[in-house]
C-alpha cells in the first residue's frame, strides 16, 4: 500500500450529491411511484420573517439551519413532556405537560414568553373551533 504522502491531491471538488427524494419513476409493474414528501417548517418560518421584516429574504442554508433548530426544540419539548407524563402515570400528554416541559427546557424570560404565547395560541384555537 502507498502512504498518504505519495497520493496526488484531488484535482477538483467532489460533485455535490442531490437528495434522492421526490422521484416519479415507474416501478416494475408500470405504476407511477408517489413522491416522497419531506415536511419542513420552511413556509411557517418564511411567514414569520415577512411579518417581522417584510423586505428581508433568507437563504436555503439559513432556512435549513432554522428548520433543524425548530425540529430540535420540538423534540426536546416532546421528550420532556413524555417523561413528565410517565412520572405522573398518565398515558396522555396534555397542555400542562407541554407547559411544564417548556419551563424546564427554556431559560428564564424566554420560557415566560413561550408559555404566554402558547396559552394565547391555544385560547385562540379553542375559540375558533367553538364558534
UniProtKB/Swiss-Prot annotation:
Post-translational modification: Monoubiquitinated by the RAD6/UBC2-BRE1 complex to form H2BK123ub1. H2BK123ub1 gives a specific tag for epigenetic transcriptional activation and is also prerequisite for H3K4me and H3K79me formation. H2BK123ub1 also modulates the formation of double-strand breaks during meiosis and is a prerequisite for DNA-damage checkpoint activation. Deubiquitination is performed by UBP8 in presence of SGF11.
Location of N6-acetyllysine modifications: 7-8, 12, 17-18, 22-23
Residue list for modification N6-butyryllysine: 22
N6,N6-dimethyllysine sites (modified residues): 38
Cross-link (Glycyl lysine isopeptide (Lys-Gly) (interchain with G-Cter in ubiquitin)): 124
Region (Disordered): 1-37
SUPFAM superfamilies: Histone-fold
Any Pfam family: Histone
Signal peptide region: none
Any one GO MF annotation of this record: structural constituent of chromatin
Keyword ATP-binding attached: no
CDD domains assigned to the protein according to its UniProt record, in alphabetical order: HFD_H2B (cd22910)
Modification sites for Phosphoserine: 11
Biological process, per Gene Ontology: chromatin organization; regulation of DNA-templated transcription
Protein family membership: Belongs to the histone H2B family.
General function of this protein: Core component of nucleosome. Nucleosomes wrap and compact DNA into chromatin, limiting DNA accessibility to the cellular machineries which require DNA as a template. Histones thereby play a central role in transcription regulation, DNA repair, DNA replication and chromosomal stability. DNA accessibility is regulated via a complex set of post-translational modifications of histones, also called histone code, and nucleosome remodeling.
Name listed for the protein in its UniProt record: Histone H2B.2
Amino acid at each position: 500500500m502507498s502512504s498518504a504522502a505519495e497520493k496526488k491531491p484531488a484535482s477538483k471538488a467532489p460533485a455535490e450529491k442531490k437528495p434522492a427524494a421526490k422521484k416519479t419513476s415507474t416501478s416494475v409493474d408500470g405504476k407511477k411511484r408517489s413522491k416522497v414528501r419531506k415536511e419542513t417548517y420552511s413556509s411557517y418560518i418564511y411567514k414569520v420573517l415577512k411579518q417581522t421584516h417584510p423586505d428581508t429574504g433568507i437563504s436555503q442554508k439559513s432556512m435549513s439551519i432554522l428548520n433543524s433548530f425548530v425540529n430540535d426544540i420540538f423534540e426536546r419539548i416532546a421528550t420532556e413532556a413524555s417523561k413528565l407524563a410517565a412520572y405522573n402515570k398518565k398515558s396522555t400528554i396534555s397542555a400542562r405537560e407541554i407547559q411544564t416541559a417548556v419551563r424546564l427546557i427554556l431559560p428564564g424570560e424566554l420560557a415566560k414568553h413561550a408559555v404566554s404565547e402558547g396559552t394565547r395560541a391555544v385560547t385562540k384555537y379553542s375559540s375558533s373551533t367553538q364558534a
